[in-house]
């Protein structure tokens, strides 16, 4: 009986110790590397790591979150209307839709005149939950700026913030 209790206690201590070591890339923090993210792009998958070396405006949205949808439009207007200086480097927009319906997303992209090439999806519920937790979006969907080194440099930037950060 003592051995069983010792074994259970050892297992409990091991569990507590193991959970104390969290991969820093699993939670978004400004100044740290962006959490890993893989999204659907048509018939293929795209990793956020594939944009290393570029500025990335990472924006999460859904039809049900009006603020996130308005942010999509702000980012689209920013990208169309602001000539970025050559020294800013390449800027990519990764707009991640969390709606279950791909058709709904496609309709909104057309209605809002968004760039189809920058639209991606997470259609798996567990991956969507991971993204919500990793990017700390418990109170609504958000937008982030990632520098060419892959570090988060801004959260929920305004158009003026985007101009200042990227140029």
Model-predicted regions and their roles:
Residues 52-56, 87-91, 115-117, 148:
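Loop/turn elements at helix/coil->beta-strand transitions in domains of secreted/extracellular proteins
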Residues 69-112, 126-131:
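Structural microenvironment flanking redox-active thiols in thiol-disulfide oxidoreductases
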Residues 47-72, 92-94:
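Short active-site neighborhood of thiol/selenol oxidoreductases, capturing the structured segment around
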Residues 83, 139-167:
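Thiol-/selenol-based redox modules, centered on thioredoxin-like
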Residues 20-49, 70-73, 119:
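N-terminal "domain-start" segment that seeds a small globular fold
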Residues 106-142, 148:
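Short, internal strand/loop/helix patches
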Residues 1-35, 167:
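N-terminal targeting signals for export/organelle localization
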């Amino acid at each position: 009986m003592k051995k069983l209790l010792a074994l259970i206690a050892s297992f409990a201590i091991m569990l507590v110790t193991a959970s104390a070591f969290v991969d820093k890339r699993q939670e978004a923090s400004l100044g740290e590397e962006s959490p890993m993210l893989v999204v659907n792009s048509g018939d293929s998958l795209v990793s956020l790591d594939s944009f290393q070396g570029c500025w990335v405006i990472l924006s999460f949205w859904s039809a049900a979150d009006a603020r996130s949808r308005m942010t999509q439009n702000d980012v689209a207007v920013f990208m169309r209307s602001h000539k970025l200086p050559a020294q800013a480097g390449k800027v990519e927009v990764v707009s991640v839709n969390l709606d279950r319906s791909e058709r709904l997303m496609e309709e909104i992209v057309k209605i809002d005149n968004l760039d189809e090439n920058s639209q991606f999806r997470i259609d798996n519920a567990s991956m969507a939950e991971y993204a919500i937790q990793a990017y700390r979006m418990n109170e609504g969907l958000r937008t982030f700026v990632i520098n060419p080194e892959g570090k988060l440099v801004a959260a929920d930037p305004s158009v003026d913030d985007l101009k200042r950060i990227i140029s």
